[in-house]
């Protein structure tokens, strides 16, 4: 099986981080599964992303503006013969729109992780990097019909655009603090969001012993869902995601020929 692991942004990771990501993905996957890390073009959302990152005010606006570029890249993935696209970002940017454009599976880590968690507990707590992530995240949860399942959401108040490896200890400390609050309020499992932090800097295995509940690895869930769908030739419901055939990737970003 061959999967595209699609970054939400056109900004490339360092070579070292790319190697680390591929090693992690392969550790979650079957021996015959391969991955290609891919990046969308910047079709206009890049400047907004830079501004929101600079102000540490990631609200979801950048994900909305990234959607056309992500749809375009997903169409390219289908044309190139990939078995599925896994969106690397844990807030599912472009996933719903992309499912309307292709028939290969497009996996959103948040939605997949919520439903996976629902098979092992009755109430889950969410952890996000910044306070500004909270409204957008809960909006997504409500859209997915999972709001009654989420018992609470907390933030670690931490985000950086560069290498986060130096933040390991403070991330663990803050995650355990808010995780314990969520468990005290009734969470029976925890989903930490913000893939650049979890599991790239801190792994769920580091958190579970202290929290005493399952900590969901969103990347591992995404890989397993993609394998399940590809191996069994399962596709998104055509009733839920009506999809025209033969969409040209360039049609997503070109100006209308009828524009004046």
Task: Annotate the PLM regions.
Residues 1-64, 129-167:
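N-terminal glycine-rich anion-binding loop in soluble enzyme alpha/beta folds
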Residues 6-12, 27-32, 36-55, 60, ...:
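C-terminal alpha-helical cap/extension of soluble enzyme domains
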Residues 9-12, 87-94, 129-133, 193-199:
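Gly/Ser/Thr-rich loops at beta-strand to alpha-helix junctions
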Residues 56-76, 170-177:
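Glycine-rich, highly charged phosphate/nucleotide-binding loops
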Residues 79-89, 186-195:
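Periplasmic-binding protein-like
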Residues 97-120, 205-225:
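Short, acidic/small-residue loops that bind anionic groups at enzyme active sites
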Residues 118-155, 165, 170, 227-260:
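Short, glycine-/small-residue-rich phosphate/pyrophosphate-handling segment
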């Amino acid at each position: 099986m061959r999967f595209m692991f699609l970054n939400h942004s056109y900004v490339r990771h360092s070579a070292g981080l790319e190697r680390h990501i591929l090693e992690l993905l392969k550790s979650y996957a079957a021996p015959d599964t391969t991955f290609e890390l891919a990046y969308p073009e910047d079709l206009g959302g890049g400047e907004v992303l830079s501004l929101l990152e600079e102000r540490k005010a990631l609200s979801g606006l950048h994900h909305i503006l990234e959607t056309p570029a992500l749809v375009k890249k997903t169409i390219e993935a289908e044309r190139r013969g990939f078995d599925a696209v896994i969106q690397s970002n844990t807030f599912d940017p472009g996933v719903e729109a992309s499912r309307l454009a292709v028939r290969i599976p497009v996996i959103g880590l948040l939605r997949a992780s919520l439903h996976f968690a629902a098979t092992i507990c009755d109430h889950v707590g969410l952890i996000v990097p910044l306070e500004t992530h909270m409204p957008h995240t809960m909006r997504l949860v409500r859209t997915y019909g999972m709001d009654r399942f989420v018992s609470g959401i907390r933030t670690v108040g931490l985000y950086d655009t560069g290498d986060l490896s130096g933040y390991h200890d403070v991330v663990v400390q803050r995650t355990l603090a808010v995780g314990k609050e969520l468990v005290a309020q009734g969470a029976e499992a925890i989903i930490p969001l913000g893939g650049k932090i979890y599991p790239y800097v801190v792994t769920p295995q580091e958190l579970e012993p202290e929290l005493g509940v399952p900590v969901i690895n969103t990347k591992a869930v995404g890989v397993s869902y993609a394998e399940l769908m590809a191996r069994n030739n399962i596709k998104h419901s055509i009733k839920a995601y009506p999809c025209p055939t033969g969409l040209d990737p360039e049609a997503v970003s070109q100006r209308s020929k009828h524009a004046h």
